[in-house]
Regions:
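Beta-strand secondary-structure signal
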Residues: 8-10, 63, 104-106
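Intrinsically disordered, low-complexity boundary segments flanking structured domains
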Residues: 1, 47-53, 92-94
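Short, surface-exposed loop/turn motifs at beta-strand boundaries within globular domains
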Residues: 2-4, 35, 57, 98
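Charge-rich, low-complexity amphipathic helices
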Residues: 14, 31, 63-65, 139-144
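Glycine/small-residue-rich interface belts in oligomeric ring/scaffold proteins
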Residues: 20-84
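Extracellular structured ligand-interaction cores
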Residues: 6, 59-61, 100-102
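N-terminal, Lys/Arg- and Ser/Thr-rich interaction peptides
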Residues: 2-23
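Internal, well-folded beta-alpha domain core
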Residues: 2, 67-209
Length: 209
């Protein structure tokens, strides 16, 4: 077993929108904050600029506990196409939001980054405004602590974070727990394009899989 330091904090917001890039003009959202978005949050707190964000956060390991149940809203907007100089086109678009979101974030990173992030969260100081997928959805952050964590051997465990369906076998004996699945991005490249996805399953609140 390998001992490591992991930092834990909560993030919440009235609304969130983690937009699926392939759903234009109907902008759907992923059902939870994903690792790429978490790295963006960390970058905002520490003041990492967009050009350096990938290199400085790519090695951060992320786990998420979805605390609040999934609540979605859909709103309709009339968008304006400004590409043409002589004609203006309006077209309707449905935009999906998550409402009343709350997550517990677990991260593992190098000691220097952990220390900087801990200091910022304890003081309540951020360099850039952290948001939940879109700049109008401001994130509220709450520091919880830095803890010792360990890498466990393969086996059967109860998990509070999303579980990769392709790499794990799930025991569905407890039928009273509502489980949700989604195919979320877990990695991106320097151009902020998603490069790797995982199909995950997760419970909400204090429920475990």
């Amino acid at each position: 077993l390998v001992d490591m330091k992991c930092l834990v904090f909560k993030v919440r917001g009235d609304y969130a929108r983690f937009r699926k890039s392939y759903t234009t003009p109907s902008a759907l959202t992923y059902l939870l904050i994903h690792p790429v978005a978490v790295r963006g949050l960390i970058g905002a707190v520490l003041g990492i600029n967009r050009e350096e964000l990938y290199e400085k956060t790519k090695d951060i390991k992320v786990a998420v506990q979805v605390i609040n149940e999934i609540k979605k809203d859909m709103q309709s907007f009339n968008l304006i196409n400004m590409k043409s100089s002589d004609k203006i086109f309006r077209f309707p678009s449905n935009v999906e939001f998550l409402r009343d979101v709350k997550y517990r974030i677990f991260i593992k990173a190098d000691e220097n980054l952990i220390n900087k992030l801990q200091s910022s969260l304890v003081k309540g100081e951020v360099v850039f405004t952290p948001y939940l997928g879109a700049s109008e959805h401001i994130a509220k952050l709450e520091y919880e602590g830095v803890y010792n964590c360990e890498k466990l051997p393969k086996g059967q465990y109860e998990i509070i974070s999303p579980v990769d369906l392709d790499s794990n076998t799930i025991d569905f004996d407890d039928s009273d727990i509502l489980l949700t699945t989604d195919n979320i991005p877990i990695d991106n490249d320097k151009n902020r394009e998603y490069t790797k996805y995982k199909k995950v399953i997760f419970a909400t609140g204090e429920n475990k899989i």
